[in-house]
Amino acid sequence: MAFAGLKKQINKANQYMTEKMGGAEGTKLDMDFMEMERKTDVTVELVEELQLKTKEFLQPNPTARAKMAAVKGISKLSGQAKSNTYPQPEGLLAECMLTYGKKLGEDNSVFAQALVEFGEALKQMADVKYSLDDNIKQNFLEPLHHMQTKDLKEVMHHRKKLQGRRLDFDCKRRRQAKDDEIRGAEDKFGESLQLAQVGMFNLLENDTEHVSQLVTFAEALYDFHSQCADVLRGLQETLQEKRSEAESRPRNEFVPKTLLDLNLDGGGGGLNEDGTPSHISSSASPLPSPMRSPAKSMAVTPQRQQQPCCQALYDFEPENPGELAFKENDIITLLNRVDDNWFEGAVNGRTGYFPQSYVQVQVPLPNGN
């Protein structure tokens, strides 16, 4: 910074402290300007908070959001593009119903068929929710972000510049500088005042565009709920048909089988041909004790030890959401390999991501993880 510029900054700082501590009077702007400043400050807070709350509305699970942010950050660091979509609750429930409906068997179970129908409906609702997310991000969140990073940023820049030039002007007047210096400072002060006023006015008088964005948001929500209502109406009719089908089916008769029906052949404890219990042979060996033998108990331990894990070589403090903190010598359970440099693991009931260079793998993950 040149000496003249440094001197100007010192003078402005001196004027600021004189006004705050010494009671000096600075140039006062009118009430209309101060009201525009207040509304602009509220708009800055509104845009920041509205973006945050809208994202939480679309993706309410904070753990899933943190995991997505961590994966996105790791992908940027590693230079690898990684597919990363928010797990819609409708989709998770749909997957559960579809999986177990097919396991039960749709051929013989109306309940299994109903589960599959319900799962397919929820899957459609999850797809509709993804469309809602894309619509809101494109037509509501992106304009807000543009407003925050361009319009508001420009207005706040003019306001900051206005404050600096006002201090410079008042400092030159207080110190009774040369007339041409005071006039030059006054001209710059007036120029910044004009730019700040026009910028704030244009921002605050743009209601048409802002309300249009709210209309788009409301229309997207209406379309989402309308499509979901159509899906649920069809599902309700289908499930009522399945209920009627289940009620009209004849009830199957079931006769439990006996040991004789199973053609068991052997010694004591069986049944005679007439169905009466046979006597236990005195030579028959006694039943084994239900107590677990030491050999069986010990056999469980190695399996537990074979769980993929690693030992921390150093302390790790997270820098991003979703990362896992741990201390040196902690034993961390390995859950997944994110890429060549990062793991996903768990320790002390917490899960998250951590760099491979901070740990020594003791039991590696199976191939493919």
Curated annotation (Swiss-Prot):
Domain SH3 per the UniProt entry, residue ranges: 305-364
One GO term describing the cellular component: cytosol
Gene inactivation effect: Dramatic impairment of clathrin-mediated endocytosis, severe defects in motility and death at the early L2 larval stage.
This protein's UniProt keywords: Coiled coil, Cytoplasm, Endocytosis, Membrane, Phosphoprotein, SH3 domain
Membrane-topology descriptor: Peripheral membrane protein
InterPro entries: AH/BAR_dom_sf, BAR_dom, Endophilin_A_SH3, Endophilin_SH3RF, SH3-like_dom_sf, SH3_domain
Principal place of residence: cytoplasm
PANTHER family: ENDOPHILIN-A, SH3 DOMAIN-CONTAINING
Record-given protein name: Endophilin-A
Annotated organism of origin: Drosophila melanogaster (Fruit fly)
Taxonomic placement: Eukaryota, Metazoa, Ecdysozoa, Arthropoda, Hexapoda
Gene: EndoA
